[in-house]
């Protein structure tokens, strides 16, 4: 991470989601980064001086609940990913609750699609509904980080 951002920018952009609060990970998010997505988030170990990237995620955030729009975009990207990852195991999980948000937003849910690599790391594409707003998130994470976010 330090090859791309300085320590001050990383520190000033820390944004910890509820599923990472009690973990050994944190993340920094950068808005308006790139042309295709309006936000990227990069997770790393809290006490790591090297700030090795454990997950990278790009997001398109919608200011309202537009799940149908998100799902259409998700399906389009999924078709591209299925060509890129044709030898990987693909799983469409259906609608799942976001357990880490159940106290703040009991209706929070998402529709993940994953591609699993040989080392059990994953690429994931999902449409999320949180606080009546929709977000498309696409990312790649290693196995160790995956175990934390699957809880």
Show where each model-derived region lies.
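Long, charged/polar, surface-exposed segments that mediate recognition or autoinhibition
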Residues: 37-104
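A charged, solvent-exposed segment within the mature domains of Sec-exported extracytoplasmic proteins
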Residues: 75-150
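Weak global preference for isoleucine
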Residues: 10, 14-16, 40-42, 53-56, ...
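Processing junctions and N-termini across compartments
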Residues: 23, 35, 63-64, 121
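N-terminal leader/targeting segments
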Residues: 1-52
